[in-house]
Amino acid sequence: NTLHILPIHQPGKMKAMGTAGSLYSPMDLLGIDPNLIDHNDSRSDKEQFKAFIDECHKRGIKVMLDMPSCASYDMFLEHPEWMAMERDGLAKTPQGWNDIRMFQPWEDEGKRTLNPKLLELHKEYVDMCIDLGIDGIRADVARAKPVEFWDVLIPYSRMRDPEFGWLAETYTYEDASPQANMPYDRPQDSLRAGFDTIYGQYHIFHEWPNAKTFTNYIKEQLEMSYKLPKGKALIGSFATHDDISPMFHGGADYCNLTMGLQATLPMLSPYIVDGYQSGDYYVYPYENTQNQNTDTDTHEMTVHRGQLDIFNLSRKPGGNQPEIGKFMTSAFALKDKYADIINKGTFIPLEKKGDKNDQIIAYARHLNGKTLLVVA
């Protein structure tokens, strides 16, 4: 079991989104947000965080920390040597995210020479994580750095901790990026560079028109895995913090459907966002209202409707349908009971009769004479 913790750094205050600032617009990659610290505790911020990680480990839970791909405007002003610039000298900003500024991974892109100062910052980040006892890193928008960057950073982490894990936020092969100022996505390249796990495309499951589309995607991922070292996998990215609540796609039934799939699919580690287990719609009454109390230079309480609020001091996630969590628990119990078949068995799509619109998913998992049948 692994706990994925969203970025812990103090958000930037300038040109911010929300009254707390985005978790992905850090002021200091090597610092901890004072809002996360108990100021009545005599221990330092990192001592408190390490104690939290130690308690996770006592419970058999590993901890993965989310590493932002970009910087705040505050960091851009303080450390221009790390930052990417447009030809007119202005900061480079990824399309749709006006509160963050992109790093410059290259010293000379033509010669494929990395920016040594940015690389050193990220090595210090890795050192911080390992010193705290963190077990791995989720690399936000992994394609924002070239393969050469990861070719250095990932082996560096494993010189200190051979078991250190890496999850790449990378989705699907792109000939060209649809997003301005953002490189194209190449999941297979990320896995070759040393990432253990990727996001994949399950977040668009609700858009797939039929079971064949779903099955073909699984086959594509399995075929990709045959070209890579053993052990590469996807997370069950049916709903991450970047997506709207699965409750909007069909309520508790949809949540249970996707959890049953997550528990039985090949090459997949189940993944949930806090609040899923009780049916949180992530709807906030203060959405896009004005608030006189703010920690940033804006009074607007920016919210992406239906998504976990990462811009304001918010409530604890939670909904009103605990039966989702009960089904999740039973699905995980099934995955544990048949771990050998699910983790090592073959994936066999099954023929169906009478399903004219191809809406029924049916497959078997088979290993050493044992077969697990899945119908959804």
Which residues are covered by each model-predicted region?
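Hydrophobic faces of well-ordered beta-strands that scaffold small-molecule active sites
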Residues: 3-5, 63-65, 137, 166-168, ...
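Active-site-proximal helices and loops of the catalytic beta/alpha 8
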Residues: 53, 57, 61, 124-127, ...
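Loop/helix patches that line or flank the sugar-binding groove of alpha-linked glycan CAZymes
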Residues: 237-240, 245-376
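The substrate-binding groove and active-site-proximal loops of carbohydrate-active enzymes
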Residues: 25-46, 100-119, 134-144, 202-211, ...
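Conserved, mostly hydrophobic/aromatic
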Residues: 5, 29, 56, 129, ...
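Active-site beta-loop-alpha junctions enriched in small/polar residues
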Residues: 8, 68-70, 142-144, 169-173, ...
